[in-house]
Amino acid sequence: MPKSKRARVYHLTQVNKKGREAKERLFSNIRETIPKYQHCFVFSVDNMRNNYLKDVRHELNDCRIFFGKTKLMARALGTTPEEEQADGLHRLTRYLTGTVGLLFTNRDPADIESYFSNLSQVDFARAGTVAPRTVTVPPGIVYSTGGEVPPEHDVPVSHTLEPELRRLGMPVRMIKGKVCLGDEKGEASEGYTICKEGEVLDSRQTRLLKLFSICLSEFKVSLLGYWSSASGEVTELEAGKTRPKREGNRRQAMNGDEMDEDQSSDEDSD
């Protein structure tokens, strides 16, 4: 007997959102961590990728990294001299804007700076990313890298990709079993521009870039500044000099209701 189309299973459960308990846990974890480490860095992340960040956590397993709402992290550190949890720490909160995190460490600051200066991973761009350069597929036979390498070091794309390339807007056609832009010699086409420098990529463009194995995103961590417990001083690093700073705290205190409305936390890492 055929299965009834009306016999559907409706799941009534929901995934619990991070609520007040998670916020309070992140808040208390940051405060408990402050006296255990000599230095606290504020870092920003370009083109966040969780798999690359996991590698950072693994390689810096003697440090502790926190991510969360910037207002919550700032409040945990203390935004005024009266509220700060250690001498001079409130001056670090001016860097807590945008996609940033806190890194607590006992390593020498020079070692941390050296590690992150050499950290860079390229990846496929996602929708919403700004194109760092113009990418144009040359006319003629379409190759697997879209013209990123010379034809003699490349191979033509498979004929099975022709329908998808057409669906994504490329005016390709089959000529003698090969996917081509214009004719086989490239004389009847000017090539196809996938994206232009400075424009925001959409999902169609990112799919085309991925089909041609073109990586336009770079996962990179920039150190903005750090606080040292021994001196109570905050040292501004090069990336922090050009980044917009957090405005001064307009309120000397925030009650629990305000924290619950304005701030939600992400998980921290040991």
From Swiss-Prot:
UniProt xrefs under Pfam families: Ribosomal_L10, RL10P_insert
Predominant subcellular localization, coarse grouping: nucleus
Biased composition (Acidic residues): 257-270
Domain of life: Eukaryota
Keyword Glycosyltransferase carried by entry: no
Region described as Disordered: 234-270
Xref: InterPro entries: Mrt4, Ribosomal_uL10, Ribosomal_uL10-like_insert, Ribosomal_uL10-like_insert_sf, Ribosomal_uL10-like_sf, Ribosome_Assembly_uL10
GO CC field: cytoplasm; nucleolus; preribosome, large subunit precursor; ribosome
Annotated keywords: Cytoplasm, Nucleus, Ribonucleoprotein, Ribosomal protein
CDD domains, sorted: Ribosomal_P0_like
Residue ranges, compositional bias (Basic and acidic residues): 238-250
Compartments, as annotated in UniProt: Nucleus, Nucleolus; Cytoplasm
A GO molecular function held by the record: RNA binding
Any GO BP annotation: rRNA processing
Gene3D superfamilies attached to this UniProt entry: 3.30.70.1730, 3.90.105.20
Subunit structure: Associates with the pre-60S ribosomal particle.
Family membership: Belongs to the universal ribosomal protein uL10 family.
Chain's role: Component of the ribosome assembly machinery. Nuclear paralog of the ribosomal protein P0, it binds pre-60S subunits at an early stage of assembly in the nucleolus, and is replaced by P0 in cytoplasmic pre-60S subunits and mature 80S ribosomes.
Name of the protein described by the UniProt record: Large ribosomal subunit protein uL10
